[in-house]
Amino acid sequence: MRLHRRGLVAGLAGVLLLAPTARANTPEAAAAFIESRGTALKEVLDSDTPLAEKRERMAEILREAVDVRGVAQFVLGRHWRTASEAERAEYLRLFEATLIRNLSARFGELRGLRFTVSRSQPRGEEGVLVTTMVEQPGQAPVQLDWLVSFASGRPLIVDLVAEGTSLRITQRSEYSAVIQRGGGRVGALLDAMRQQLSALEQRELAQK
């Protein structure tokens, strides 16, 4: 099942984080936030730290600076309102775990990654869109646009746009389709997410 279309995009969505707090909602602050995360990303990916420690470091970064709950709720859409408390809790757990494993399962592929900020543009109440070029050894550069929100008083990544396509909107459509195929049950999505997480865990183990 295709819950995430691009491994690189899905992994990076939870990585470029944990910049020094920037209170000003400006393109410059957002660009500095993303640029600092490019440096932090390379340090972790290019290190010889054991895989489990790398994963934990990325998990800490993710929890501190991405609006995981906000993005997760957006992706689930109207189904968030109909989900039970237990389903919501399990969904949030699986959503975060999948973000982390999407990256850790690809640590080897991402080693040697190059990351450059090219511009930043205000997007009104949404925040600031920061454009970057990401290069992997032996592959053509990929343009990724990061939507940074300052609504909480500090920068938080709330979306990633690749080739004009919003990751959170794409995920929302895919998750909704899974629920529809499952008879409208959020539980059907949770089952699919567990399967995906298990596959990512196996892929991570194969790197060792």
List each model region and its residues.
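N-terminal export leaders
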Residues: 3-9
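Short beta-strand edge/turn micro-motifs at domain boundaries
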Residues: 141-169
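Bacterial N-terminal signal peptides
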Residues: 11-17
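Low-complexity, intrinsically disordered terminal/linker segments enriched in charged
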Residues: 162-208
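Sec/Tat signal peptide C-region and signal peptidase I cleavage site
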Residues: 20-24
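Surface-exposed, charged secondary-structure patches
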Residues: 100-142, 200-208
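Solvent-exposed loop/turn segments at secondary-structure junctions
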Residues: 80, 97-98, 122-123, 136, ...
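Early exported N-terminus immediately downstream of N-terminal targeting peptides
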Residues: 27-103
